[in-house]
Curated annotation (Swiss-Prot):
Record has Ubl conjugation as a keyword: yes
One Pfam family from the record: Flu_NS1
Post-translational modification: Upon interferon induction, ISGylated via host HERC5; this results in the impairment of NS1 interaction with RNA targets due to its inability to form homodimers and to interact with host EIF2AK2/PKR.
Gene3D superfamilies: Influenza virus non-structural protein, effector domain (3.30.420.330), S15/NS1, RNA-binding (1.10.287.10)
Protein name: Non-structural protein 1
Organism classification: Viruses, Riboviria, Orthornavirae, Negarnaviricota, Polyploviricotina
Amino acid sequence: MDSNTVSSFQVDCFLWHVRKRFADQELGDAPFLDRLRRDQKSLRGRGSTLGLDMETATRAGKQIVERILEEESDEALKMTIASVPASRYLTDMTLEEMSRDWFMLMPKQKVAGSLCIRMDQAIMDKNIILKANFSVIFDRLETLILLRAFTEEGAIVGEISPLPSLPGHTDEDVKNAIGVLIGGLEWNDNTVRLSETLQRFAWRSSNEDGRPPLPSKQKRKMARTIESEV
């Protein structure tokens, strides 16, 4: 196993522990708590994949961080902060909407890269809006935290979430995953549109109703599927 992979996991575990202590003192805001919960799932998945214990890794990560801080000067810290581009965290959903449990009558699940797409195929003839919480850098989606599909009544009927064991995705990965979710929901005559923030940052262009144009490859794939079932 690569030593950098192990040490990276150890440092991530310790930094998560520090953030958890901060949250335990009721000092974290909603975006902070969102990321904390998601990162915990990611760390558990990575620990399982690597065969490493999180508690042991946290102690090792503490030693690594302490060693770095001992060598770090205030001037070097200022230069590091100045050189890192700042990202923004955007929220379509409340904490309640993000953490709410939901159930599917006819579940369908698909994995696309490091993203998991889930939808309820029993939903028909509904107006659906896609909402997401994500970070943005250079006016583009950087990291998806969670995307969910809501009916006008507020019911959750679909979801796109990062897989804890496979961290890392691009804005193009998210775009393709949304296309899959939209295609699945529209198959049952649902009308799907995107929130304004998704329209702006996940796509640079969309139809007037907020519905993004499907990538040409996806259109061809859907057309072949329809033809094969007729």
